[in-house]
Structure formats: C-alpha cells, structure tokens
Amino acid sequence: MEEEIILLDYWASMYGMRTRIALEEKKVKYEYREEDLSNKSPLLLQMNPIHKKIPVLIHEGKPICESIIQVQYIDELWPDTNPILPSDPYQRAQARFWADYIDKKTYVPCKALWSESGEKQEAAKIEFIEVLKTLDSELGDKYYFGGNEFGLVDIAFIGFYSWFRTYEEVANLSIVLEFPKLMAWAQRCLKRESVAKALPDSDKVLKSVSDHRKIILGID
C-alpha cells in the first residue's frame, strides 16, 4: 500500500520547487495541490497554523513545513535513491550552511526586486548581487555546489533561476551576462528530469509578476 503524500504548493514558488525536485529525485509518488495564495485553503491553514504559507508536505496526515526541512525529511525517508545530503558529516554540515545562507540572504531582497520600486528596489538589487557573487565564488569550477553530485545546495537555489528573467526585466538587473558560471550550473541542473519538471517557464513567471505589479501594486 502506497504512503499518502500530499504537497500544498504554488506553481511559481521557488521554495515549493525544492520539495518537488526532492520528491522527483526520490521517484516518490505524491498528490500535488495548487494553492490560491489570496484565498488559502482550510487544509493549508490547518496544516501550517503558525506561518500559514506554502509549501506544506503532508505525509500520512502529518505536516512538515519549511522547504529545506522538507527536502531533508524526504532524503531521510528514502536514503537509497539519489542521496541529497552527503554521507560525510563535515560535507553535510557545509551543505546545510549554504542552504541556510540562501534562505536567510535571498528572501527579503528577492521579494523587494519585484514588489518595490525606487530606492527600496535599488537597495534590493545591491543586496541580491552580493549574494550572487558569494554563491558564484562558492560554486567556482565545480559541476554542482557539492562537487560532482547534485545535492541540497543545488536544490535550495535552482528554483531562483526561473525568476532570473523577471528580476532582469522588472529591476533592470544583469544576471545572465554577469554570472556565466551560475548560468552554466543552472543549465546542468536543468538536464535533470526532476529540475526540468519542477521549474516553470520564465516567461510565465514574468507575466504573472508583471500583472501583479500593474493590477495590485500599480507598478509598471
């Protein structure tokens, strides 16, 4: 009998993409439920009463919240298929450090890039570029962030790639030209079926964000 696994998510969420990628890497069957973020479902509010946000992974009726925690949970449940965390304790700690860095350093500036204008957007641009420089340096000449194996840090960051065009268009950023190593890394990740299935089309993301800025925020 198959385990019941439900993912409450939103198609454009780079955080939900992490969980989708992890599930696909492990070849785990699950039920995907799209959430309307302007009218959150009773199930979402019940399963994540503290933060009331996606993604929420529901395993046999039990909720697991926060995407990086979900990815590690999935890796622990199915350790034999495409391991996400390295077996070496130090390397595992390093992977967790960089995943945490991505979470702590990207959320505020990335949201401001598309939801703000003027000085706030300019400040967000500077902050995000510094993050990209740091990650570019950490990647170096490695195939993936952890070396030759696709892992936690790759999963933590690759979802942002689907938003890069949006950041470039709405915030006048130059990411593709300025960070060729990160772009090459993203293309390598996209060759994996799990990533290709999880990441939405960048044009779709741009249109959604542009519509939101114009209609809801009144920003061109």
Swiss-Prot record:
GO terms for molecular function: glutathione transferase activity. It holds the Pfam family GST_C. It comes from the Eukaryota. Its main location: cytoplasm. Residues 3-82 form the GST N-terminal domain. Disulfide bonds: none annotated. Belongs to the GST superfamily. Tau family. This is Glutathione S-transferase U23. It comes from Arabidopsis thaliana (Mouse-ear cress).
